Amino acid sequence: MTDDIVFENMVIDDTIVEEEDVEMKYYLKNKKEFEFLAKEMLSGKKILFITGAGLSINSGISAYRNTKTSVWSNFITEWGTRKKFEQDPAQFWNHFWLRTHEKQEYLDALPNSGHLAISNFVEYLGSNVITQNVDALHLKAKVPIEKLVEVHGRISLYKCITKGCRFEYDDTIDNIEIGDYSINGTTMKQGNLEITPPLCPECKKPILPQSLLFDENYSSHQFYNIEKAMDWIQEADIFIFIGTSFSVGITEEVICHAQSERKKMFNFNIFKETKISGLKSIVGKSEITLPLLERQLLYEAQKRNNGKKQIWYGNTIKRIVSENSMLLKEAMLKNDTKSSVKV
């Protein structure tokens, strides 16, 4: 049995040879990182995934930066503000939001193999996920809502900014059909939807998408769950970034904490990040590299199960992680006891 067992006994179809070549290329390029990370994932340590727009590109959703079609380059910084909305709600919706975010292809988007791998990691390992994406694809991939913080919001949900309204901070509006506000015979499916600004069901004032805008902060609405996110950051032992450009506040928080506490960080992206110290890179498209990591994890679990093959390794992984987690807790208790003994 060799370390390359991940690729043994594969049935190669002529129609997918090119895909398998890409997989093998990515695997060999990142082999040491896959092996190391898979072992760390089985160690019982707490893992936190932080996902960005790059994860959803394969699902047909434009990234925010670093591509020719990126939403970032399409005036998002100018228009993505509460100030712009207050100046002209109709223009905000029709000129900006419905052209860059709440579009039919975004609403119809499905999770790709990267999302599905993360969902499996959450199930196997009990990991948590903080996403910068508003596309709801982690939920579509069956990540439990209690294991997910959508720190930048979610499309098809809305908020009010009228002072004193319960939807200003405490609650989220989830019962509005945006197409009901269409004008001039336009529709979402035709890609030309124009609307009159939707109104708050409570105070009847124009409402905003439930999305963190550039002149807002994470504590501007409870939906963004910033306190929960910060707790997860403090508790985690290993941080795995996927498809992020490290250009927003939440990634800065994670990096500062990880570096100060000397915690391990891994980055899945199409390029190697060289400006952040202590960050190990797995280079390649996340819809390929994340399933490869899952295979490596299954292989490591099989090795620790004395090579016994099983139909599904989920329970084996959970058992190994649980056992190692208990060992870690026992070791920490011993260290705490030793440090508390007076000399």
UniProtKB/Swiss-Prot annotation:
Q: Which CDD domains match?
A: SIR2
PROSITE patterns documented for this protein: SIRTUIN
Keywords, in A-Z order: Metal-binding, NAD, Nucleus, Transferase, Zinc
Q: Name one GO molecular function term.
A: metal ion binding
The positions annotated for binding Zn(2+) are C160, C165, C200, C203
Phenotype caused by lack of the gene? Null cells could not be established, suggesting that sir2E might be essential.
What GO CC terms are in its UniProt record?
cytosol; mitochondrion; nucleus
- According to its UniProt record, this protein's enzyme class is transferase
Q: Which reaction does it catalyse?
A: N(6)-acetyl-L-lysyl-[protein] + NAD(+) + H2O = 2''-O-acetyl-ADP-D-ribose + nicotinamide + L-lysyl-[protein]
Q: Report the superkingdom from the record.
A: Eukaryota
| Localization per Swiss-Prot or TrEMBL | Nucleus
Q: Which SUPFAM superfamilies match?
A: DHS-like NAD/FAD-binding domain
Q: Which residues form the active site?
A: H152 (proton acceptor)
Q: Which residues form the Deacetylase sirtuin-type domain?
A: 27-300
The EC number(s) this enzyme carries: 2.3.1.286
Q: Does the keyword Phosphoprotein apply?
A: no
The UniProt family comment states: Belongs to the sirtuin family.
What the protein does comes down to: NAD-dependent deacetylase, which plays an important role in the regulation of transcriptional repression. May play a role in cell cycle. When overexpressed, the cell cycle is accelerated.
- Full protein name: NAD-dependent deacetylase sir2E
According to its UniProt entry, this protein's organism is: Dictyostelium discoideum (Social amoeba)
